[in-house]
């Protein structure tokens, strides 16, 4: 019923799989939302329920949780190899174009002429990617990596794996001091 209401009123859903797992909030019906035409994007929630705030981890967890949900119905690749499971590309879609659709933004979500130049890049010449045949699957199925480059609106914010717009060491120092003050009351 809820899914029909979302679709009827053009509501979008921010799926936060890591937060849902941490809080035991259940498994969102992403396959059903998408089949009904509901826009689904990914979120990291907040530090109260997701300390990592790593969008690639959310992409991976969205895919894996959707597969766990299918498994809870008794499905297994070994008993039905033709059943449709969320793919790495579909999960990456949720973290890019899906998020843009939820926000009603047509200027982000994909690399196209006239859109904001927002993208990330990962060097694939690492041991964790050795033998890969599909770079998207390698990045999504593998352990979440620290990206080598991130560009937001045409400007580098991560370069060679380091924040390019702030002094990362100073930021960590300030963050740790603030956390100690909060804990001290």
Give the residues covered by each predicted segment.
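A general structural motif
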Residues: 1, 21-26, 102-103
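Acidic, glycine-rich loop-and-beta core segments that form the ion-binding/anion-interacting portion
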Residues: 1-14, 20-21
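Residue-level signal for inorganic ion chemistry
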Residues: 13, 45, 154
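C-terminal active-site-proximal or functional interface alpha/beta core segments in diverse enzymes
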Residues: 16-27, 52
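Extended hydrophobic-aromatic, low-complexity segments
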Residues: 24, 110-112, 129-132
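His/Asp/Glu-enriched, well-ordered alpha-helical/loop segment
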Residues: 29-126, 141-142
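C-terminal cap of metal-dependent C-N hydrolases
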Residues: 116-172
């Amino acid at each position: 019923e809820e899914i029909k209401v979302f679709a009827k009123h053009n509501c979008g859903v921010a799926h936060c799989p890591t937060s849902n797992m941490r809080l035991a909030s259940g498994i969102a019906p992403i396959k059903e939302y998408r089949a009904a035409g509901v826009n689904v994007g990914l979120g990291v929630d907040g530090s109260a329920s997701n300390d990592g705030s790593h969008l690639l981890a959310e992409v991976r967890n969205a895919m894996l949780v959707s597969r766990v949900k299918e498994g809870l119905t008794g499905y297994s690749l070994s008993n039905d190899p033709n059943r449709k499971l969320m793919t790495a590309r579909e999960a990456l879609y949720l973290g890019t174009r899906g998020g843009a659709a939820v926000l009603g933004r047509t200027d982000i979500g994909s690399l196209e002429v006239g859109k904001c130049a927002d993208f990330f890049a990962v060097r694939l010449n690492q041991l964790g990617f050795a033998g890969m045949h599909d770079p998207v699957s390698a990045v999504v199925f593998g352990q979440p990596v620290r990206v080598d480059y991130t560009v937001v609106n045409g400007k580098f914010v991560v370069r060679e794996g380091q924040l390019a717009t702030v002094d990362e060491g100073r930021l960590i120092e300030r963050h740790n001091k603030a956390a100690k003050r909060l804990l001290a009351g």
